């Protein structure tokens, strides 16, 4: 990777003297490169003052990096020649690969085979190129070269990079490295993250992501990197239409957005919901890393109140000043001022009043960072105010237009972010708390307190698969029991006499449910009877059979589940779905028939730790209900966490289990019981 970012000799294969051609723009962009540049084009001997050769093989010295801009069908041959020349890396700008359809995908596979054969590291294809500002290497066809900075930017979209580079020029944002990933035929986000973690010129890493192909690799790498440097991701393709567009854009597998969110959370990656957030977070994290208590200092009550409200919205704690701070403020501020947080120094405040107040707040041991909000009054000298902010732990919200331009330049040169909107400023500050609390810390491996019977579960699953079972219900409950998961007492009856024997064994009242691989929602077809007593059992048994046969005549009925009626408790859902990119994804939420409407659920990628299991429970809105409301007894949270851990382990041990729904699970003051269950079996995704 070092040669990709720090080449001494670069060859542009497909260089052109013709204005407007990509090969021409790249040659122009490399004029300031600190190394040597060669053009490759059989038609010319010189392009823009650079020596030109008919093939990379003819260049009279070793080449470290090739930039390839020839038509797609010629790219494999160009990479083969690079391999024969011992070129270590190639950036393939050319489009027309897997993003273009079946033939393009075939060509991309051929390209990768050639690169692997010769050990050439590929960036792209279908990308904008790469930038390393440290050595003035702009190997892209962007018209704008970014300023030097401490932000590295990885993006699947080249066009997005073009827009960002222009914006960054206007806003004084610099970059260390910029990489357009394109189709990621060989090198992907994870590979570049590993390199950038060790890059001394990079402090913050930003990623525009449409999808990853190896989600577990990304999690493993991101978790390691995020412990050292903030990683902020903007994920596109969240909706079905967005995912479809992402797929057609770079051939990405967008996967489940819930899986990505869970992966980011577990890896310590900060997710930005917009371009604005992406760079707001980056600018804050460049300057500060420590989360803490915020003081608000303003010359206008309204914006101060906006900021205080935003603190509540985004979870930013407001500082409680010590008595000495309040005493010092009262010594010189007008009596009408507000001496508490937010501090309002009034609309007639001068820069001197502002500066003195800021100094006092900065000296308070309870204050970690100050948000300074100033509006353009006749009394306020923004230049002096900006100078007093330099050197302080502060974020500015200098509200105005031309009157704040010069002061903004002073702030920018010191790396102090300035926002027009107080709410946006607080939202940006909130990232400091998020970064300090991320779950990127080393996770301790936790063993289950009770061992599981993996081989027993494996035998049951094999028998179910041999019998042709794909969607499995009650007959799969022994799999749960093998993993120590508590199931309400039950039995499966093939006739009414068996049903009666089971009911007498487990005790009345009971629940009867149809057992059929074709019936998913049993209550919708009359396949469930609740609170069945001894005298009602026979009638209920035959009513279930009649109801299902009448409403789903083609359904295969394999029996009737007879289960102990479980009263009381709160209904939960625990589930697992195997994501194509990330593997088993564990779900938790409030259960029952309304789960699809309420969608009060949380997700994690397996394996999960006990701490993460508890986090999943706390994240749902209904957590307060589980804690106990209005004198109700609290639910057994530890038992729920244990259940989640067991489902996580089951999903990892048995890749042929594609999906599981434990719904509902009844949880009590002590313990829980799985009441209904569905499992989908098949080949691993």
UniProtKB/Swiss-Prot annotation:
Regulation of its activity: Activity requires divalent metal cations.
Keyword Protein transport found: no
Broadest EC class assigned to this enzyme: ligase
All copies of domain ATP-grasp, residue ranges: 477-513
EC number: 6.2.1.13
PROSITE patterns in alphabetical order: ATP_GRASP (PS50975)
Entry-linked InterPro entries: AcCoA-synth-alpha (IPR014089), Acyl-CoA_Synth/Transferase (IPR051538), ATP-grasp (IPR011761), ATP_grasp_subdomain_1 (IPR013815), CoA-bd (IPR003781), NAD(P)-bd_dom_sf (IPR036291), Succ_CoA_lig_flav_dom (IPR032875), Succinyl-CoA_synth-like (IPR016102)
Activity response to pH changes: Optimum pH is 7.0.
Temperature dependence: Optimum temperature is 77 degrees Celsius.
Binding site for ATP: 503-514
A Pfam family reported for this protein in Swiss-Prot or TrEMBL: Succ_CoA_lig
Catalytic activity: acetate + ATP + CoA = acetyl-CoA + ADP + phosphate
Keywords, sorted A to Z: ATP-binding, Ligase, Nucleotide-binding
Keyword Coiled coil attached: no
GO molecular function, one term: acetate-CoA ligase (ADP-forming) activity
Annotated SUPFAM superfamilies: Glutathione synthetase ATP-binding domain-like, NAD(P)-binding Rossmann-fold domains, Succinyl-CoA synthetase domains
Disulfide bonds: none
Family from the record: In the N-terminal section; belongs to the acetate CoA ligase alpha subunit family.
Function of the protein: Catalyzes the reversible formation of acetate and ATP from acetyl-CoA by using ADP and phosphate. Can use other substrates such as propionyl-CoA and butyryl-CoA, but not phenylacetyl-CoA. Seems to be involved primarily in the conversion of acetyl-CoA to acetate. Participates in the degradation of branched-chain amino acids via branched-chain-acyl-CoA esters.
Subunit structure comment from the entry: Homodimer.
Record's protein name: Acetate--CoA ligase [ADP-forming] I
Taxonomic lineage of the native organism: Archaea, Methanobacteriati, Methanobacteriota, Archaeoglobi, Archaeoglobales
């Amino acid at each position: 990777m070092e040669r990709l970012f720090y080449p001494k000799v670069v060859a542009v294969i497909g260089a052109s003297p013709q204005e407007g051609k990509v090969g021409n723009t790249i040659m122009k962009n490399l004029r300031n490169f600190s190394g040597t540049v060669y053009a490759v084009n059989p038609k010319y001997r010189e392009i823009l003052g650079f020596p030109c050769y008919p093939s990379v093989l003819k260049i009279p010295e070793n080449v470290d990096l090739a930039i390839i801009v020839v038509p797609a069908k010629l790219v494999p041959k160009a990479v083969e020649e690079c391999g024969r020349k011992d070129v270590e890396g190639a950036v393939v700008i050319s489009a027309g690969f897997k993003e273009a359809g079946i033939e393009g995908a075939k060509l991309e596979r051929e390209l990768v085979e050639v690169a692997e054969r010769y050990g050439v590291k590929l960036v792209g294809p279908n990308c904008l190129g790469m930038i390393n500002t440290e050595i003035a290497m702009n190997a892209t066809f962007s018209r704008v070269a970014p300023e030097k900075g401490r932000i590295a930017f990885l993006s699947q979209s080249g066009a997005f990079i073009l827009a960002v580079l222009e914006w960054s020029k206007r806003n004084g944002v610099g970059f260390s490295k910029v990489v357009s990933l394109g189709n990621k035929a060989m090198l992907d986000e994870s590979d570049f993250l590993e390199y950038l973690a060790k890059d001394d010129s990079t402090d913050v890493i930003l990623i525009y992501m449409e999808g990853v192909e190896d989600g577990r690799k990304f999690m493993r790498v991101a978790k390691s990197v995020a412990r050292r440097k903030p990683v902020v991701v903007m994920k596109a393709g969240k909706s079905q239409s967005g995912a479809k567009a992402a797929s057609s854009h770079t051939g990405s597998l967008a996967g489940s957005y819930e899986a990505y969110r869970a992966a980011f959370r577990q890896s310590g990656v900060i997710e930005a919901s917009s371009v604005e957030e992406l760079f707001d977070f980056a600018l804050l994290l460049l300057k500060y890393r420590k989360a803490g208590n915020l003081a608000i200092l303003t010359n206008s009550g309204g914006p101060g109140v906006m900021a205080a409200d935003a603190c509540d919205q985004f979870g930013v704690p407001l500082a409680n000043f010590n008595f000495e701070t309040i005493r010092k403020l009262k010594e010189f501020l007008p009596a009408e001022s507000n001496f508490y947080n937010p501090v309002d120094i009034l609309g007639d405040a001068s820069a001197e009043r502002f500066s003195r107040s800021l100094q006092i707040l900065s000296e308070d041991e309870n204050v970690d960072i100050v948000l300074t909000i100033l509006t353009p009054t006749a009394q306020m000298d923004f230049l002096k105010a900006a100078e007093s902010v330099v050197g302080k732990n502060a974020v500015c919200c200098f509200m105005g237009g031309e009157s704040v331009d010069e002061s903004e330049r002073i702030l920018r040169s010191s790396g102090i972010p300035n926002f027009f909107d107080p709410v946006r400023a607080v939202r940006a500050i909130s990232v400091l708390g998020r970064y300090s609390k991320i779950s990127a810390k080393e996770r301790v491996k936790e063993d289950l307190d009770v061992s599981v019977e993996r081989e027993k579960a494996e035998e049951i699953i094999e028998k179910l698969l041999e019998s042709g079972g794909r969607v499995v219900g009650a007959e799969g409950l022994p799999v749960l029991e093998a993993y120590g998961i508590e199931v309400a007492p039950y039995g499966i009856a093939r006739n009414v006499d068996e049903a009666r024997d089971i009911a007498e064994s487990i005790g009345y009242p009971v629940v009867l449910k149809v057992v059929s691989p074709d019936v998913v929602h049993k209550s919708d077809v009359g396949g469930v009877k609740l609170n069945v007593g001894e005298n009602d059992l026979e009638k209920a048994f035959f009513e279930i059979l009649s109801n299902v046969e009448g409403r789903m005549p083609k359904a295969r009925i394999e029996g009737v589940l007879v289960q102990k009626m479980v009263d009381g408790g709160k209904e939960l859902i625990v589930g697992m779905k195997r994501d194509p990119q990330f593997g088993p994804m564990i779900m938790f939420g409030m259960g029952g028939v309304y789960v699809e409407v309420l969608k009060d659920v949380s997700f994690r990628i397996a394996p999960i730790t006990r701490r993460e299991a508890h986090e999943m429970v706390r994240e749902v809105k209904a957590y307060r209900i589980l804690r106990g409301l209005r004198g109700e007894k609290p639910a057994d949270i530890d038992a729920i966490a244990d259940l989640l851990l067991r489902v996580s382990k089951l999903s990892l041990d048995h890749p042929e289990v594609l999906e599981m729904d434990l719904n509902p699970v009844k949880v009590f003051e002590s313990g829980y019981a799985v009441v209904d269950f569905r499992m989908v079996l098949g080949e691993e995704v």
